[in-house]
Amino acid sequence: MNGSPTPKRYSSKSSRLYDDYYNIPYQYSNPTPMNRDYNDVGSRINADKLVPEEYKRNTEFINKAVQQNKELNFKLREKQNEIFELKKIAETLRSKLEKYVDITKKLENQNLNLQIKISDLEKKLSDANSTFKEMRFPKVKDPMVDDDPVSENYDQINVPKHRAPDATGNPRTTNKVSNTSDQDSRLKAIERTLSVLTNYVMRSEDGNNDRMSPLPSPLNTISPINNRLNFQEPKRYNPTVKVNPSDDDIMMYESAELKRVEEEIEELKRKILVRKKHDLRKLSLNNQLQELQSMMDGDDNIKLDNVSKHNHATHRHSSQSSRDYSPSSDACLECSNDLYEKNRVKPENNMSETFATPTPNNR
């Protein structure tokens, strides 16, 4: 230890390079080392020579095994995560598959029911057609053969009695008339049932075709404005005809209908505005025409009054001056001509008089 009170004052800057010399342990002593791996100076002795090679191999093998174990654990975690994700996907797919299986079963049942109904309706239709043909074209009976049983006694002849004209007709003819009326009523009833059945079959076939066909877009369901002028509108898609329409179909159909109605309203508004403009224009033109007609009628009346009341002898216009040679617009044609003839020839002025300087009166 330096005993100087100010050791740095007398030390140079270059001495700082050797300050570490005083920090060397055991500089002034030589203690016995506590560990065999270190020498007297304190440096580590090469201990690899002392460790046998078997221990070295064992440590290397253990280190490799630990590293492999870590890598395998990492791969195992990744595989477990993948398996978890695949299980989730499999559950969702299973639920969707069950849903679609239920839907297909329902559709198959509906199809079977519809086929059964169609077969029953076809049977009824065929039966109705056969009965209709039988009623319309009955079997023609032999007119010579009588319905009543012929009596075996040929000697007896049934002679009709003479009846009064007021008596009732032949009951056989009345029965025939009643039978024909009954047949006509039955034929009408059968025709009604046939029409109902055919309409029902056609509707069911249209429903099946709509179910098999893809859903049209709402833009295709909207008829353009130019086509609406035609009286025969095209057949629009109506999902309500279906047996079980979905909510999306109904919403699409309603939105398309709303859009079509809005377009029709806008078209009607435009037509109404154009009609109002035409009406206003017509009123204004009629008013102008009436005003012009009234003005023309008033001018004609004024001219007639002036012609009837005009006196050429006593007439004098404001335009009858010495400087006005043109006929006045207010004067009549004769007066204006007379005025022009009077003022046409003027006396010539003397040049000396024109260029002479005027003399004042009070000179």
Swiss-Prot record:
Subcellular location: Nucleus; Cytoplasm, Cytoskeleton, Microtubule organizing center, Spindle pole body
Sequence positions bearing Phosphoserine: 213, 217, 284, 329
Keyword Coiled coil on entry: yes
Gene Ontology cellular component annotations, sorted alphabetically: cytoplasm; nucleus; spindle pole body
Residues forming coiled coils: 62-136, 248-297
Record region (Disordered): 160-184, 310-363
Regions crossing the membrane: none
Superkingdom field: Eukaryota
Biased composition (Low complexity): 319-329
Keywords: Coiled coil, Cytoplasm, Cytoskeleton, Nucleus, Phosphoprotein
InterPro entries: Spc42
Gene3D superfamilies hit by this protein: Geminin coiled-coil domain (1.20.5.1180)
Polar residues biased stretches: 170-182, 349-363
Family: Belongs to the SPC42 family.
Stated role: Forms a polymeric layer at the periphery of the spindle pole body (SPB) central plaque which has an essential function during SPB duplication and may facilitate attachment of the SPB to the nuclear membrane.
Oligomeric form and interacting partners: Component of the SPC110 complex containing at least CMD1, SPC29, SPC42 and SCP110.
Protein name, as recorded: Spindle pole body component SPC42
Organism: Saccharomyces cerevisiae (strain FostersO) (Baker's yeast)
